[in-house]
């Protein structure tokens, strides 16, 4: 058969389609300007598990950049404003084919609840022959507790574009998978 996987990719391609443009903010119905909903930068945190809905553990981070570079784990965002698309090539580890992708737009640093920056995430490692987990990674349940920068009354005013997050799941099966991610604003103005 024909292999449709790009030659530069280490793993299988995952195509990401971003929708929502932040308008589906669940905390308010406040409208937002185009500059508030724009995606200027994007980090994709990849978690893997043995089964769908299982114990997802951190695998790697992909960051938006000027060029696609699989070795550096960077990707180029195509499109403009809120209509963005991207492709990543996550590392495949035997035994953990189920992936959960957490996308964070317009915020490059994550914090613990007390305001301190998070410690570096620990990547899961599996035995290449058996697929058994040899090194446990940071759990997705812990990752979901992290925060973006806290706004202080005396601090810098809220800037645009606004922080948005979204997530999606897929399984490494064929050469290409498409994941639709709905980004939601995490802050709004009143």
Which residues make up each language-model segment?
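Sec-type signal peptide cleavage vicinity
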Residues: 1-190
């Amino acid at each position: 058969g024909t292999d449709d996987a790009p030659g530069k990719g280490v793993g299988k391609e995952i195509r990401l389609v971003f929708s929502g443009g932040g308008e589906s903010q669940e905390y308010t119905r406040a409208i937002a300007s185009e500059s508030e909903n724009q995606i200027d930068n994007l980090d994709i945190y990849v978690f893997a598990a043995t089964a769908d809905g299982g114990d997802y553990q951190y695998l790697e981070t992909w960051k938006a950049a000027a060029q696609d570079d699989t070795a550096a784990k960077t990707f180029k965002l195509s499109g403009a404003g809120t209509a963005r698309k991207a492709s990543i090539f996550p590392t495949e580890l035997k035994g953990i084919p189920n992936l959960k992708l957490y996308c964070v737009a317009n915020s490059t640093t994550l914090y613990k609840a007390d305001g301190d920056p998070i410690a570096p995430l620990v990547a899961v490692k599996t035995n290449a022959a058996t697929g058994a987990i040899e090194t446990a990674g940071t759990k997705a349940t812990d990752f979901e507790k992290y925060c973006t920068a806290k706004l202080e009354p005396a601090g810098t005013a809220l800037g645009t574009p606004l922080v948005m997050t979204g997530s999606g799941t897929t399984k490494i099966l064929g050469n290409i998978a498409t994941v639709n991610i709905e980004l939601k604003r995490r802050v709004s103005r009143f």
